[in-house]
């Protein structure tokens, strides 16, 4: 019995010293949003770059200066804030700047954006992603 207590008494400090002291650093996890996939960009390498390129082409192709606003020399910068929703559709959140006619044209242009082939993603789940697009209306007169 004395031998058991003696072995236990000797091994106790070994257990105590075998534990390491240290600090646990926080793990920082950064999750990157993945842009929605514009129709036709499914096979492209970078969905984000393709989305930006297709959005710029869409805006340029569908841009129209409202005739009455042009005639009245209405100019200004209109900023449209919108979301591409989890279902891949456009949801306008805010329109500011410019005149009412210029705002309506900017809204019309953005609402013509097609439904995305895939929505934006965050951590592997569909995520609504916010975009802000400026429209500069100048008549050059």
List PLM regions with ranges.
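Charge-biased low-complexity segments
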Residues: 5-7, 17-141
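N-terminal signal peptide c-region/cleavage motif recognized by signal peptidases
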Residues: 11-15
